[in-house]
């Protein structure tokens, strides 16, 4: 369940809509879209989309639209597409990282191998764009294709930065923006675009563009906070909460903000070669050293600042929409508290 979903549902329900019904429709349509693609490939695609998750991105599509009642087919298509893209990136990430667990379950690459996992991710990407294209408008496809291009660049940046002790704070956030925040931005832009189509006479074109940009900025800011908090959670664990071993980022050479800042505070960490870590126990011991520096508290403060910045970027919106989006932003932090 997405952060703050219960409170968000109550706010939106007061405006005459049922968030849970919309999200059920998203789930059902995703399941239909990945069915019928062969026994093996279809099985892994279905398992991927049914594995759960926060469904935060489709929720943002719905809330950014400002359409409280009777969401359009265009809006549902956008919500489905953005979540399928997210699922596809997770499958491909696991291939590149060699991850064996996600959400406490074996990954596709662990259970079926690299070729099958790559094909599963490709299928999810294809179904996402087919779903958008079937709506007949070019703008949603443009928004999502731009985001997928950025996702690919972010993944390559992460590979380039692997094991690199000199990754800067700026480069870390550039990578987070590409790998994570752009899809949050796309979710909000897709929602805004669908909402404007639903209300074609609602304001001048310039105002509609500013609204889309402001909502996109909101999404990008909470996406950055989301990724930073996720990186903190990799250090703090525990595995039963994260669904993966504590310190998994350290073991695959991914340098995140907690480690970058801890190296500034502890000279012994500055000389640590991540390639020397071989076991989960060794990674957990380094996590304890990172936590002892106070770097996690600093990182949390930065994430909280990003959430406050996100809320400050929201334009003047209907009360239900403003409240619901602010609750989602707060929920990103609350999930990690």
Give residue ranges: language-model regions.
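Short, structured helix-loop boundary elements
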Residues: 16, 20, 75, 141, ...
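Mg2+-dependent prenyl diphosphate-binding active-site environment of isoprenoid biosynthetic enzymes
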Residues: 31-268, 330
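Short, charged, low-complexity loops and linkers
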Residues: 5-13, 106-108, 164-170, 285-293
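Short, amphipathic C-terminal "tail helix"
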Residues: 6, 306, 313-337
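Short acidic alpha-helix initiation/capping motifs at coil-to-helix transition points
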Residues: 20-22, 120-122, 250-251, 301-306
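N-terminal amphipathic/basic leader segments beginning at the initiator methionine
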Residues: 1-33
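Mobile late-domain/C-terminal helix-loop "cap" segments
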Residues: 266, 270-314
């Amino acid at each position: 369940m997405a952060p703050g979903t219960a409170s968000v549902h109550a706010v939106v329900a007061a405006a005459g809509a049922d968030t849970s019904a919309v999200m059920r429709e998203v789930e059902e349509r995703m399941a239909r879209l990945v069915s019928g693609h062969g026994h093996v490939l279809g099985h892994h695609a279905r398992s991927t989309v049914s594995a759960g998750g926060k469904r935060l991105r489709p929720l943002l599509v719905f809330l950014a639209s400002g359409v409280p009642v009777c969401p359009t087919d265009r809006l549902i298509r956008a919500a489905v597409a953005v979540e399928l893209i997210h699922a596809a990136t997770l499958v491909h990430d696991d291939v590149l990282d060699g991850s064996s667990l996600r959400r406490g379950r074996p990954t596709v690459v662990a259970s079926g191998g690299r070729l099958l996992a790559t094909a599963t991710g490709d299928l999810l990407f294809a179904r996402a764009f087919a779903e958008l294209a079937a709506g007949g408008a070019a703008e949603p496809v443009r928004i999502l294709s731009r985001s997928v291009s950025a996702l690919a660049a972010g993944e390559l940046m992460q590979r380039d930065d692997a094991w690199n002790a000199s990754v800067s704070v700026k480069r870390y956030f550039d990578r987070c923006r590409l790998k994570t925040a752009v899809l949050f931005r796309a979710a909000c832009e897709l929602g805004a675009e669908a909402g404007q189509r639903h209300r074609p006479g609602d304001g001048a074109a310039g105002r509609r563009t500013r609204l889309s940009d402001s909502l996109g900025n909101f999404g990008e800011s909470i996406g950055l906070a989301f990724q930073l908090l996720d990186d903190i959670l990799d250090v703090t664990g525990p595995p039963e909460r994260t669904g993966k071993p504590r310190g998994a980022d350290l073991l695959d050479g991914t340098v995140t903000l907690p480690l970058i800042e801890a190296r500034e505070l502890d000279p012994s960490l500055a000389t640590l070669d991540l390639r020397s870590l071989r076991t989960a126990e060794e990674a957990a011991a380094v996590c304890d050293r990172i936590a002892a520096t106070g770097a996690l508290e600093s990182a949390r403060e930065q994430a909280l600042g990003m959430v406050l910045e996100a809320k400050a970027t929201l334009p003047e919106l209907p009360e239900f929409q403003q409240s619901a989006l602010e609750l989602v932003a707060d929920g990103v932090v609350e999930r990690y508290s």
